[in-house]
Amino acid sequence: MATTALLIPCYNAERYLPNLKKQIEALNPKFDEVILVDDGSTDRTVERGRELGLTIEPLGVNRGPGAARNASVKRCRAEWIHFLDADDEIAPSYLKKVLPLTNAGVDVVLCACEDIDEQTRKKLMHWDYPDELWQKEPIRGAIQRGVVTYASFIRKAKFDEIGGFNEERRCWEDGDMHLRLALAGARFRAVPDVLCTSIRHARGTSGNRLYCHRCRLGFLQEYAKFSPPIDARDLIGEVMQTAAGLYQEGDFSAVDEALNLALRLGWKGPDSGHAGIKILNYLPFPWLKKMAFLKQRERRNRQ
């Protein structure tokens, strides 16, 4: 039987620790290792953990989620790892559902997940990862369906092979890690069950939409260097989605940066229904001239 580890980075998580302890105790079967690390909290996270009987190792200065998760991996010996944030929730049957797929030909097992509002418990997002897509086209899946951290059960050796999480950016580092797994040849499977839930509130980094859009653009600029094996059309679609988000947040210089990236990838201008059409009416005049030129050139090429 494969050995397993539940890895939990904590940052100002004092209020969530009682529920986290209940989540851990309810697991059946249980993980072989449960490792909690504190990423420079300014509240009583470490002390409250001790009061509850949870061992939380302080890491010192706050370095962000990617660095904290990488630190937790270095402290475990298990063959398979699952990341959970201190304010996340995990189904008691988690291991029962994912362990049957951990054979010699698999490196990552995904599960469906949900995001819910902390106050209302209303479902905000459903993350679904079709097994067939992830078996056949994991790179496309990772670009089009960014995988959240709590969705995956990962072979530690494969995680170590890619160098773990990016520690420079504090948003989209989870989607980036899973894409790099796919690019490294990791073999994926997925179960349809909702096994993990993320509690959403305004205090986390993901609540800063502008910062997250900028992180996504930074990652996409890096991925443009890997086309192929990443399909340029998939990248263009993600770039335009990001450009639309940046426009909504008012970062017009980043919008310009995103559109230039799309052009370098071969974008010919937005079609009806394309994400880019949402921002076309708001582009400055030089961009409108550029779009008109592209359309004219495309028509000439067809003649």
List each language-model region with its residue ranges.
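Short, flexible, basic/aromatic active-site loop/helix in glycosyltransferases
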Residues: 112, 126-145, 149
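Acidic donor-binding loop at a coil-to-helix junction in glycosyltransferase catalytic cores
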Residues: 170-179
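Conserved donor NDP-sugar-binding/catalytic core segment of glycosyltransferases
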Residues: 93-124
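A conserved acidic beta->alpha catalytic loop
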Residues: 38-46, 61, 85
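Glycine-rich, basic loop-to-helix element that forms the pyrophosphate-binding segment
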Residues: 59-76
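Catalytic core of nucleotide-sugar-dependent glycosyltransferases
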Residues: 186, 194-202, 206-233, 253-265
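Short, well-formed alpha-helical segments that are part of the catalytic scaffolds
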Residues: 12-26
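Short aromatic/hydrophobic "clamp" motif used to bind/position activated sugar donors
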Residues: 81
